[in-house]
Amino acid sequence: MRVTVSIIKADVGGFPGHAHVHPKMLEYAAAKLKEAQKRGVIIDYFVYNVGDDISLLMTHTKGEDNKDIHGLAWETFKEVTDQIAKRFKLYGAGQDLLKDAFSGNIRGMGPQVAEMEFEERPSEPIIAFAADKTEPGAFNLPLYKMFADPFTTAGLVIDPSMHEGFIFEVLDVVEHKVYLLKTPEDAYSLLGLIGTTGRYIIRKVFRRADGAPAAANSVERLSLIAGRYVGKDDPVLLVRAQSGLPAVGEVLEAFAHPHLVHGWMRGSHAGPLMPARFISVDPERRIAIGPKMTRFDGPPKVGALGFQLHEGYLEGGVDLFDDPAFDYVRQTAAQIADYIRRMGPFQPHRLPPEEMEYTALPKILAKVKPYPADQYEKDRKKYIEAVVKGAKVEESQHD
């Protein structure tokens, strides 16, 4: 059976602030998707959150970028915004919905999208990841570890079906170019690109032996769409596992080190990506309530739900980070967060200028008047005296 798995995610209101979502939002979204399932639009679904973002996991046979599936997601997010978020005056109601009306494809309209179409195998494990308070490039390092690092994925060495390696599809989100790199031989070139996480983002991974899709990552950059800061992108990631692909445990091993990512408070700080537990997972209701974002609106967190796909139906989910094996990782992330928070507004905790241009910082800096250095150096005393007296140096004196 040929099946498509789609994850479409949006922040349509925080409760309170940017910490979490209102439970009624998840319930409304699940009811909306259940109705679509009854109409035959989708085969199955699951609704979950990480922080203040709602993810809609849907299976169907309509292929990627399908207007019916994207339209269903858009309509669901709009109704959740209008019926729940605005009624309860939730923070940032509808903030990821950057357009007024749906135009056939949800890409470029604000929500994050990760989709894969493939032939369902005799056993089809899939893992749906979602991260909050970070950007799509946050998954670059884990994806590299899963599919190109033999110290993470032993199958690259000992599984003949994986030994040929993988093909990485990398998107340059600034110049809108696509790179296709093969591992292991292109590994150094690949790292040269994806180490710049804000620009070069791994969008897809394919098995090199037969071109089978292995992973799909969302790549929408909200600030590049809106031209202003409207919240961090908060990506979603879909990974297939086992039988010629990394095992479930190898996929999860990629998150065993809480690497630094961009985002966190006001989308302006670097912090550790913490693999977090879900508060509750209810397969019967098709809802999972994810972790809250607390300290400094974070730290950045990622959740993982595992499913077995059968004839397009989702068996699960299983909270894959809900295990003592990840307790030490979480503790390490907390220690890293504590260390880097002590740097306050200084880099490298605060992001570099090019990452700050879509925040409110340029407006703050515009209020601070600089002086030409050559003029200032000639008569420093005059400038200092003017500041002491609360006076302004005349424009003609330094222009």
Swiss-Prot record:
One of its GO terms (molecular function) is fructose-bisphosphate aldolase activity. This is Fructose-1,6-bisphosphate aldolase/phosphatase. One of its GO terms (biological process) is gluconeogenesis. It catalyses: beta-D-fructose 1,6-bisphosphate + H2O = beta-D-fructose 6-phosphate + phosphate; beta-D-fructose 1,6-bisphosphate = D-glyceraldehyde 3-phosphate + dihydroxyacetone phosphate. Mg(2+) 4 binds at D233. Mg(2+) 2 binds at D52, D53, D132, D234. Catalyzes two subsequent steps in gluconeogenesis: the aldol condensation of dihydroxyacetone phosphate (DHAP) and glyceraldehyde-3-phosphate (GA3P) to fructose-1,6-bisphosphate (FBP), and the dephosphorylation of FBP to fructose-6-phosphate (F6P). Mg(2+) 3 binds at K232, D233, D234. The gene is fbp. Homooctamer; dimer of tetramers. The active site is at D11 (proton acceptor), Y229 (proton donor/acceptor), K232 (schiff-base intermediate with dhap). Pathway: Carbohydrate biosynthesis; gluconeogenesis. Mg(2+) 1 binds at D11, H18, D52, Q95. Beta-D-fructose 1,6-bisphosphate binds at H18, Y91, G104, N105, K133, Q242, S243, R266, D297, Y358.
